[in-house]
């Protein structure tokens, strides 16, 4: 369909505050029974919880395990859980001119072996899994879940030595300040930094605003 042919049109947008969508009078399909949506931009899960509890908003997304547990049993609030297709991953540049050491396949395998996937899942919350690659478990082409015993620091160190980095190296990790389904990517970046320090890789976290792309 052409752009602008949907059932709603954006009538207002205030950066970092709210988006207003109103019924499209020229929509070609079956009419919707909701005239307007006001989408508040509020990345903080605790603030979302308070505004939801106070009746100021009708729906809250990107909630954390902690905030959901506080809302359980609350009057007039329903918690809906479901599987998503969201996959988080670390991209390593294959071009040596830009990626430096991480362009080396052995280094990439060392990084995979050095990460504490159980700890990462703890940060991400209940229900999360670690797939083998970017194809989520349950979809065609998925290799299934990464086994719990995949992490092996000694193997990671050996791979780094074979690649020519027995003492590790310094590397930048660029991460946006996005809250993805209740998970702060900057928190995950700090976890990755801590994990890789165990094998001599010194990670410098470079944070950039989501709006910067």
Question: Where would I find each of the regions flagged by the language model?
Answer:
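Gly/Pro-rich hinge or "lid" segments in bacterial periplasmic/extracellular proteins
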Residues: 1-31, 36
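Ligand-binding "clamshell"
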Residues: 69-81
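Structural transition elements
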Residues: 8, 129-162, 178-187
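Ligand/substrate-recognition segments at binding pockets and active sites
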Residues: 15, 161-213
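A bilobed periplasmic-binding-protein/Venus flytrap-type ligand-binding module shared by bacterial periplasmic
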Residues: 22-25, 84-110, 114
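Periplasmic-binding protein-like
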Residues: 99-139, 184
């Amino acid at each position: 369909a052409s752009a602008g042919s949907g059932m709603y049109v954006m009538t207002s947008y205030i950066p970092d505050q709210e988006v207003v969508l109103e019924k499209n009078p020229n929509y070609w399909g079956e009419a919707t029974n909701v005239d307007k949506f006001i989408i508040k931009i509020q990345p903080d899960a605790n603030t979302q919880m308070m505004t939801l509890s106070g009746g100021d908003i009708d729906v809250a997304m990107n909630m954390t395990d902690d905030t959901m547990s506080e809302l359980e049993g609350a009057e007039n609030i329903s918690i809906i859980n479901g599987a998503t297709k969201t996959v988080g991953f670390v991209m390593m540049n294959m071009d040596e001119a830009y990626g430096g050491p991480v362009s080396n396949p052995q280094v990439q395998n060392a990084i995979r072996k050095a990460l504490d996937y159980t700890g990462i899942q703890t940060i991400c919350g209940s229900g999360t899994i670690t797939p083998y690659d970017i194809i989520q478990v349950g979809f065609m082409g998925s290799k299934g879940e990464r086994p719990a015993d995949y992490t092996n620091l000694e193997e990671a160190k050996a791979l780094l030595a074979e690649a020519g980095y027995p003492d590790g190296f310094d590397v930048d990790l660029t991460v946006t300040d996005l809250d993805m389904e209740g998970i702060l990517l900057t928190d995950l970046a700090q976890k990755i930094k801590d994990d890789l320090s165990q094998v001599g890789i010194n990670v410098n976290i470079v944070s950039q605003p989501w709006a910067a792309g």
